[in-house]
Every structure is written in C-alpha cells, then in structure tokens.
A protein has these predicted regions:
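Catalytic nucleophile loop of clan PA
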Residues: 103, 214-234, 425
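C-terminal recognition in membrane/secretory proteostasis and scaffolding
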Residues: 1-18, 23-27, 32-39, 52-53, ...
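Long amphipathic alpha-helical segments used for membrane anchoring, targeting, substrate engagement
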Residues: 58-91
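A conserved glycine-rich beta-strand in the N-terminal activation segment of trypsin-fold
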Residues: 26-36, 88-110, 132-135, 159-162, ...
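C-terminal subregion of chymotrypsin/trypsin-like serine protease catalytic domains
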Residues: 231-267, 272
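Flexible, gly/ser-rich surface segments that form the specificity/activation loops bordering the active-site cleft
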Residues: 117, 161-165, 173-204, 241, ...
Length: 482
C-alpha cells in the first residue's frame, strides 16, 4: 500500500552527500577578505614610543617605566617573568623607553591609544607606517577607561582609520588585531569575537570585547578591525598565567572609545553622569519578594544623600527598569546609559515600587572626581556606612555586615570599598569588593580592628593581607620598594 501526502508535485531526490563550494576557493575568499581589511587599516596604525627620564624611571611601586607595555592594566603581573630582553625590570639604563600602538583618528594628527601606553611619559614620539615621525605636543588621558588621545606637532593629511560600530558585533565575527608586539611593527593577527561585555578589575569604566586574535605586549592601543577594515575596538590587555599569549585578549569597544576620545579632544577630560545610588542585580527571589515575580531590572540598594537620585525621590528597593526609554536589566547597563546621558538635563527613570510602575524625573549631574572617597581616617561611604581610609596604602574599607556579600558567608573580615587608582594597594592588585581577613597574622572583623592592625605600619615596611575573593583565598604583599 502506498500513502500519498499533499499534492501530486514532482518528487525531488536529495543527495545524501552535502553539496559544498570548492574548499580552496572558499579559503582563498576568506584570505582575500583578510588581505583587504589589513591593507585598508594598517596605514593608520602607528608605533607609540614613550620615554621617561632617569629621575622619573622608578614609579611608586618600584617598577621601572617602559619594560611592560601592559603596566597599569589588570594583567601587568603576567608579563613580569615573560618579557623579552630590553623589557626586563632593573635594566640599569639611564632612562627607559616603552613601545605601544595607536591608531590615527583625525588627519590633523590625533592618535587614539591606551592610557597605560603613555602614562607618566616625559616624551612621546609617534612613528607612522611610512616611517615618518612626529612628536606629541599634547596628551589627554582617561585612566578610568584606560584611553588617551595624543595630538601630534605639525601634522596634516595623515591617513585615518575608518571607525565601525562595535554594537553590531556578534560572537563569532572575524576580526584582526594590528599593532607592534615586541616592537615587531605592523603585525597583523586574526581571530574571532569570543565574548562581549567582559569586565576587568581596575579598569572600571570599560566593558570589553574578548577575542582570540593574538595580542601581546606592544599591541596595547592598536586597533581591532572587522573584515571591512573598520576599527571596532582598541586592544588593551590579555589574560595569561604564563606571561605569553594564551588565546584570551581584550579590546575596548570603539563606540565607547569614540565617546571618551571625543570628550578628551573637545575639553581635555571626560564628564560622566551619575544618579547617586548603590545598585545590584535583581534576583528572581528578590523580584518575587518585592511583588514582581519574573521582573528584570536593577535593584536600588541605597540612595546617597544630596545626590540627583535623592533629590528626585528615588527610594531604597526601587527597581529601575528603564532610563530615558532605554530598558536596563543589569547594573552595568544602567551605569552605561546614565554616564553617557546629558548632564544638567532631566531624564525619565521608570521604577517599580510596591509592584507599580512609577516615573521619576532625575536631573543628572556630573560624577564628582573622587565621589565617596575620603581623604584620610574615618569617613562616610555612599549610603551612610562608616569607613576607614588609609592613604599610605590607598585602601578604604567598611564592615562586611554593612553590605550583602553572599560570596563571603561564613568568613569574617572587612570589605575593600575603594582603592586609590595610583596607590600601593592598586599596584599590588587589590580591587574593590575583596574581603580582607587578616593583616599579617591578625584577624580583622571590623574597621576598628583593621585600623588597629595597621597602626604603625608603613609602606616601606609593608603589610601582608590575607584576602578572600569569590574564587577563594589569596595573600597580597603591599610594600613600597625603595
């Protein structure tokens, strides 16, 4: 018996063997795309040479300038044992030179690079792909995003990069990293976008692209480009436990870099808007507890006094679901849209309060430079908790009990609330959110005990901190080398 299904259309037989294009032709087509992108982008990629004079060679942490192009990033430690000759610490030369990368974004001589490439340099020289050299006459930096713009002397009609749209990138997209790793000028490597939205310790105001395109010391500041030859990121750091490339690199999305660089070029600094709230991810349990099961949003845990949010009437336990019509579902997404909003203007913030939507008009203000950071001794953190700040070590701590920290249940200690960006703690790798359990062999469970434990300690003598992170226990030595 035969069964007929549907209409009596002619039968089409499908081959069991999949039909494919000529694999060599397909590979050649991809190779041609790489060649085209590299050819379009390389002319605008530059070598950034920074030099620090002898009297400034040693930084506060005792690290010689220039030997590590990743200095100041979360990954500088990975290169201390793996640097090539000429980059080794204590090199003994009367002055030190560093080499990084950059990309020309304005034909009149504006180069975009990383802050850590030019930070602290007495002299910066830019070398173009055609061999021409220019002196930097002005450098503007934004350490919070690790970006800098360099203005060149007597430059005109320079080759400029085409800037793409990093928001359009999709995981799996092909990209090229271009730069000067280990002083090998105009090196091109290929890879894909491995992930988006990565966050890295000390660089608080950037959300990184992750790529497996090879990035090494000297690549910092160079472009990550798509197959159209458009810059989609600024290569910044790698993750490695050996000092060598291990397939994980990070780049600042060009949309973010463009926003920062435009402000640096226009005014010399970056103004970011702020609300003045402590926020957290809204969990499913908390959403249900607040009467909004399944709701996505950002939970307001505290409203700081005398801030835009406080003036507007934002309340603790409000759930922010949109800002100026843009939905927000994570603390970082809210921070991004707020910091780029127009300062001095009113913005509609939609919150859920007692299960009902409420629209609050907030006049966003510029984020104060040291918001919440006390100068020394006891202070008050945003939200009202008492803190203790030690300037010699550059740490501000608060009691663990003052902040919900599920990762530290069962552990006593004090929470690192803030770290001076250029302080000894930052140089030692300490970051906000870490739990300090002991100073030396002395357990600390309150800011009083922490203050007593470091009494009389000096940066020159150093302190050993036993800490707890969400990944486990660690020990950090904070000591100023002299």
């Amino acid at each position: 018996m035969a069964l007929a299904l549907g209409s009596a259309a002619p039968t089409t037989l499908l081959s069991a063997e999949p039909t494919t294009a000529d694999p060599v032709a397909a590979a050649n087509a991809l190779s041609q795309a790489f060649r085209n992108a590299a050819e379009k982008a390389t002319a605008s990629v530059v070598v950034v040479r920074s030099e620090t004079k002898a009297q400034n060679v040693t930084s506060k942490g005792g690290q010689n300038r220039g030997e590590n192009p990743f200095r100041g990033t979360p990954f500088e430690d990975f290169f201390r044992d793996g640097m090539p000759e000429g980059f080794s610490p204590r090199g003994g030369s009367p002055s030190r030179s560093g080499v990084g990368s950059g990309v020309i974004v304005d034909a009149a001589g504006i180069v975009l690079t990383n802050n850590h490439v030019v930070e602290g340099a007495d002299e910066v020289t830019i070398e173009l792909s055609d061999g021409r050299e220019f002196k930097a006459v002005d450098i503007k930096t934004d350490p919070d995003s690790d970006l800098a713009v360099v203005r060149l002397a007597n430059a005109e009609d320079l080759p400029t990069a085409a800037l793409g749209n990093s928001d359009e990138l999709v995981i799996g997209d092909w990209v090229l990293a271009i730069g000067n790793p280990f002083e090998l000028e105009t090196t091109v490597s290929a890879g894909i976008i491995s992930a988006k939205g990565r966050e890295l310790g000390r660089i608080r105001r950037a959300k990184f692209l992750q790529t497996d395109a090879a990035i090494n010391p000297g690549n910092s500041g160079g472009p990550l480009v798509n197959l159209s030859g458009e810059v989609v990121g600024i290569n910044t750091a790698i993750a490695s436990n050996s000092g060598a490339y291990q397939g994980i690199g990070f780049a600042i999305p060009i949309n973010q870099a463009r926003w920062v660089s435009e402000q640096l070029i226009k005014s010399g600094s970056v103004q970011r808007g702020y609300l003045g709230v402590s926020i957290a991810q809204l969990s499913a349990d908390m959403a249900a507890k607040l009467g909004s099961p399944g709701q996505k949003g950002v939970l307001v845990t505290e409203v700081m006094s005398d801030t835009p949010a406080a003036v507007a009437g934002v309340q603790d336990l409000d759930v922010v679901i949109s800002f100026d019509g843009t939905p927000v579902d994570s603390p970082r997404s809210l921070q991004e849209v707020v910091e780029r909003s127009s300062i001095g203007k009113a913005h509609d913030v939609v919150v859920l309060r007692d299960g009902k939507e409420v629209t609050v008009s907030v006049q966003v203000k510029a984020l104060p430079e040291q918001f919440g950071m006390q100068q020394r001794g006891r202070g008050i953190a945003p939200g009202g908790e008492e803190t203790f700040y030690t300037k010699p070590f550059g740490i501000e701590v608060r009691d663990k009990s003052s902040v919900a920290q599920d990762a530290y249940d069962g552990f006593e200690g004090v929470l690192v609330d803030r770290v001076d960006p250029d302080g000894l703690a930052a140089e030692g790798g300490l970051v906000p959110g870490v739990l300090i359990r002991k100073v030396g062999k002395t357990s600390v469970s309150s800011i009083d005990e922490f203050e007593a434990a470091i009494e009389g300690e000096t940066p020159e003598g150093g302190i050993v901190l036993q800490i707890r992170t969400p990944r486990g226990n660690a020990v950090i030595l904070l000591k100023k080398e002299v």
